[in-house]
A protein has these predicted regions:
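A Rossmann-like FAD-binding core segment of flavoenzymes
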Residues: 65-74, 78-83, 89, 152, ...
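Intrinsically disordered, low-complexity terminal tails and inter-domain linkers enriched
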Residues: 3-12, 123, 130-140, 173-189, ...
Length: 293
């Protein structure tokens, strides 16, 4: 999806607050900057570390990143957001991008294998398959662990790359990568997974596609509607049930489905940025998301 058209007609007094600082939030700020948004943007981050991308955004003159100050309370009537340490921020438009969290506890060694949580993970899965295939000189044997829509999408990506994965819903306890040869181009080759029942499976690569739940507690406590299966309910233009509040990324749900499984973060950010610019200038913009048939 293309970036929103540059706009210099937005009010310089418009204040956008973003609850969250993950990939979706970062993409949104980048899109607003690209469109020359003239107001102010405040990002409330639960991170104490300073990843490079976030630091780059913090250098923008209209952007303030509050590291280690996650949003803890929304007063929709007053249009304010408070943090756990008592800071309060007034907004004209609030975007909730608090992401999602795994349902189960982390799996030991998960960093040594591939994972699938959103559409944005598809390119990394494809690249991992290609790297392992080059290393082995053949199609790799893949093990896919997980259930639900994320596992279904991960399987589709693997099959598109010529891998017929062995799929299991058993709960993994640990991922154990085999020792790779010197000069290996892939950290994912010849992996194994051990399950909680003591059984194990060995393959050339392991993909974890475990269930995740939207971090929608902040929104729910402010009276926003949430989906039965989790996630902040949004309309086709990313608006929530409360005026002036929007949601993107894995915290949101459209038509009952976690947004990260429907649209890439960058695409959602670009579309939401267009809507925010439209709201700031009081000019209507066309909706983007389409309900499932």
């Amino acid at each position: 999806m293309s970036a929103p058209a540059p706009s210099t007609s937005t009010s310089a007094a418009t204040r956008i607050v973003i609850a969250g600082a993950g990939p979706a939030a970062q993409a949104l700020v980048a899109q607003l900057d690209r469109a020359r948004f003239a107001g102010t943007i405040t990002m409330l981050s639960n991170r104490d570390d300073t990843p490079e991308k976030l630091l780059e955004l913090a250098m923008l003159p209209q952007v303030s990143v509050r590291f280690g100050q996650p949003a803890s309370h929304i007063d929709a009537a007053k249009r304010t957001v408070a943090t756990a340490d008592g800071m309060e921020f007034t907004y004209d438009q609030l975007v909730i991008a608090t992401g999602s969290a795994p349902v189960a506890n982390p799996v030991d060694g998960a960093a040594q294998c591939l994972s699938y949580a959103t559409i944005d993970d598809a390119p990394r899965i494809a690249d991992g398959v290609q790297a392992v295939a080059r290393e082995l000189g053949r199609r790799p044997v893949g093990i896919l662990v997980g259930t639900g829509a994320a596992a279904g999408q991960a399987e589709a990506v693997l099959r598109a790359k010529g891998v017929r994965p062995i799929r299991t819903t058993a709960r993994p306890a640990a991922v154990i990568p085999a020792v790779v040869s010197a000069g290996s181009s892939s950290p994912f080759a010849a992996s194994a997974v051990v399950f909680e029942d003591g059984s194990s499976m060995t393959g050339d690569l392991v993909v974890l596609a475990e269930e995740r739940v939207a971090r929608d507690g902040l929104a729910a406590s402010a009276g926003l509607r949430t989906a039965a299966g989790g996630g902040i309910e949004i309309s086709r233009d990313f608006r929530t049930s409360v005026p002036g509040i929007w949601a993107i990324g894995d915290a949101a749900a459209f038509d009952g489905v976690r947004l990260g499984l429907l649209v890439a973060a960058a695409s959602a950010a670009g579309a939401c940025a267009t809507q925010l610019l439209s709201a700031a200038s009081a000019a209507p913009a066309a909706p983007v998301l389409q309900a499932a048939a």
